[in-house]
Amino acid sequence: MERMNQKVGIVGLGLIGASLAKALSHRTDCTVYGLDIDRCTVEMALAEGTIAAELTDLGQLDVLIVALFPQATVEYIQENAEKLRKGCLVMDICGVKKQV
C-alpha cells in the first residue's frame, strides 16, 4: 500500500538540501521539515514555502535526509539515531564521499 503525505525531514538546507526540500514541497504531497545551523536559512525556507516547519521531532518522520558534509553526517546520525522511529528511512546526499 502506498503511503501518502509522508513526513520528510531534511537536515542541512544548503544548496543541495534546500533544492531537494523545494522540489518535494512543491511537487509531492510530502510534508517537509527542515533544520539548519543558520537560523536565517531556516526562516527564509519557511517564508518561501520550501519547508512546512522547522524540524524539531525526529520521531515523527517517515524519511530523514541528511545533507551535511560526510563527517558531520556520521556525527549527526550517531547522536540522533535513538530519536528516530522504527522504520524511518535514513539517507544522505553528501556532495563529497570518503571512507568515514
Question: Where do the protein language model's features map onto the residues?
Answer:
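Conserved acidic residues
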Residues: 52, 62, 88
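NAD(P)+-binding Rossmann beta1-loop-alpha1 motif at the extreme N-terminus of oxidoreductases
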Residues: 1-54
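Rossmann-fold NAD(P)-binding glycine/threonine-rich loop
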Residues: 94-100
